[in-house]
């Protein structure tokens, strides 16, 4: 558990550097044969074909490339090569976040790859904006993450927030949780889809240098406990993919909140937002890229229904971690 949660901080990118805007199809003076120039000051300058170069300087701990587009378009990274010419997407492509309106690449997403100093190259399509964030400072012995909770309605979530804080503190991570802000009633029930206009408007209220948690009364179109805007979310980039949704209704039995489950869900989805995948997916064939997290193989599926449960995996295979593949919805009274 210690290695799992501290990995969050290795991947965390809350230090803004610089933003660049570009388009994959708007510069009419470019030609496809144009050679990309090395980005200066961390400003991405791809050519008309979407190919670009950027420099990672010595001392960089991690970096995150954002690509945004219209909500009905999925921006795509087709290549990311380190200074030695190694193509990271060959082995880590399945962990590159891709969704309509927003995609990203995070390095390191695995201990197999470091943000090596030197000239990196990339290729992207279907984007309207590109942005590069870098972390250049090491973590302190007791790192701190700023968290901003928002809530629709009058439920008291203070106990759940304390449970969430304790989950992180047991691994030496401090959560600086600010006072909960109350949302307007129009955000009481929203879509799970971060491209939905109402959801996007709500999430865009969040600051770019915090993890923004939105506790909503219910989803209009899903029965999830919660969901994050991405793995990772748009850390350092203010907008509609800069937050986590948590469904209060799904955590109630007989009208009462299950604070333990609510705190665990908040910690689970926050882990996704910071870049953590499930250690094992329920099919038992896909595992996260972090070496020190336990894997639960399909051979543990004792009832042969092709879906692993927490009981089948047990503590030995990571079922007791907050990032395990799923949490269980409570039974409604």
What are these regions (language model features)?
Residues 1-8:
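Bacterial N-terminal signal peptides that target proteins for export
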Residues 8-17:
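Bacterial N-terminal signal peptides
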Residues 16-45:
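Bacterial Sec-dependent N-terminal signal peptides
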Residues 45-90:
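Acidic, Ser/Thr/Pro-rich low-complexity intrinsically disordered segments
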Residues 83-211, 215-221:
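Propeptide-to-catalytic entry region of secreted or membrane-anchored zinc metalloproteases
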Residues 149, 199-284:
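Active-site-proximal segment of zinc-dependent metalloprotease catalytic domains
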Residues 280-298:
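Post-HEXXH active-site segment of zinc metalloproteases
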Residues 325-333:
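Conserved small/polar residues in nucleotide/adenosyl-binding loops
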């Amino acid at each position: 558990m210690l290695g799992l949660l501290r990995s969050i901080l290795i991947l965390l990118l809350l230090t803004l550097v610089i933003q660049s805007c570009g388009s994959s199809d708007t510069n009419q003076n470019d030609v496809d044969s144009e050679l990309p120039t090395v980005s200066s000051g961390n400003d991405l300058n791809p050519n008309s074909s979407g190919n670009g170069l950027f420099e990672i300087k010595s001392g960089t701990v991690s970096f995150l490339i954002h690509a945004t587009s219209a909500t009905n378009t999925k921006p795509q990274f087709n290549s990311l090569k380190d200074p030695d010419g190694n193509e990271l997407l060959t082995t880590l492509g399945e962990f590159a976040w891709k969704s309509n309106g927003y995609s990203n690449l995070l390095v390191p997403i695995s201990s197999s790859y470091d943000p090596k100093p030197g000239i990196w190259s990339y290729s992207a399509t279907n984007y309207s904006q590109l942005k590069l964030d870098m972390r250049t400072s090491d973590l302190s012995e007791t790192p701190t993450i700023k968290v901003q909770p928002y809530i629709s309605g009058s439920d008291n979530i203070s106990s759940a927030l304390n449970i969430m804080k304790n989950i992180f503190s047991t691994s030496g991570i401090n959560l600086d949780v600010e006072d909960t802000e109350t949302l307007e009633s129009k955000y009481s029930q929203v879509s799970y889809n971060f491209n939905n206009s109402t959801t996007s408007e709500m999430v865009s209220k969040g600051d770019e240098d915090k993890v923004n948690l939105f506790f909503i009364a219910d989803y209009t179109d899903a029965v999830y406990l919660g969901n994050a805007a991405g793995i990772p979310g748009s850390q350092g980039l203010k907008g509609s993919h800069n937050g986590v949704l948590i469904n209060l209704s799904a955590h109630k039995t007989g009208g009462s909140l299950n604070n333990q489950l609510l705190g665990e869900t908040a910690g689970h989805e926050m882990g996704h937002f910071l870049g953590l995948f499930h250690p094992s997916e329920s099919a038992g064939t896909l595992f996260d890229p972090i070496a020190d997290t336990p894997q639960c193989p399909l051979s543990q599926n004792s009832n042969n229904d092709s879906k692993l449960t927490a009981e089948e995996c047990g503590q030995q295979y990571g079922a007791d971690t907050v990032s395990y593949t799923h949490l269980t919805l409570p039974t409604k009274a």
